[in-house]
Amino acid sequence: MFFSRLTSQSTATFSKQIAKLRAALDASDAVIIGAGAGLSTAAGYAYAGERFEKLFGDFAARYGFTDMYSGGFYPYDSLEEYWAFWSRYIKCNRYDPIPKPTYGQLLGLLRDRDYFVLTTNVDHCFQRAGFDKKRLFYTQGDYDLFQCSKPCCQETWDNEELVHYMAAAQEDLRIPSALVPRCPHCGSPLTMNLRADDTFVQDKGWYAAADRYQDFLRRHNNMRILFLELGVGSNTPVIIKYPFWQMTAKNERATYACVNFGEAVAPAEIADRSILIDADAERVLDALAVQAVR
């Protein structure tokens, strides 16, 4: 399905848009959350600026990059340096406490509701906040998983224990060589299970989650579904945004809601069943919580 043009947020006030979203949430038979990087940004995960300087100022001084994202792609001279960066990166963005209660607020809105989460985020925040693992599909990987860099197999490995060891043992921005993780099958270096190219490993857990998502869609076909998109930008629209638009267009009982600061749009074809809120997720979730107690 092709859409002719996009429409931006309505002229309704923020409070009226929140009331519409609250009503759509309460009237829905099921809620499908589409979560992008903006949701984790709202939860306090800043990858540049003050937080970056506090956590990675020493790396910035030596290597010259100015944000965590760039540090992840830096061509380090050794695996010891590479894993010094990545172990600290994983620790602070996966294993340290979530800075703000944003994900917990979202879970509170979904309690006793039939929901599923589709996300491109890889920081494990949904599970850490208490979401049911069987209602989650992380399409792009997870910070807490390693995979073979070749890859020689379609397996992944939990990394929590080793990440903490590496983060604690590093000196002069290097980890001890003995801690460099290697594939137990072929001996190649392990790498992060994050989608970057065609070497990304989709393990049994990935396929099981994909099947559960498709089953959820089948079971709720033509029901009153709220497709609630939170912080989804335009980097990978084929995963969440375009499918949400298409499914809303096909199901006349569905509502599409887009919460995204500076980028709240929908096709004109579904404008009458769209709720577009140009604000960050933290502000919207706070407002929905207030609506709930009135």
Q: What is the predicted function of each stretch?
A:
Residues 1-294:
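Conserved catalytic alpha/beta core of Sir2/sirtuin-type deacylases, generalized to analogous enzyme cores
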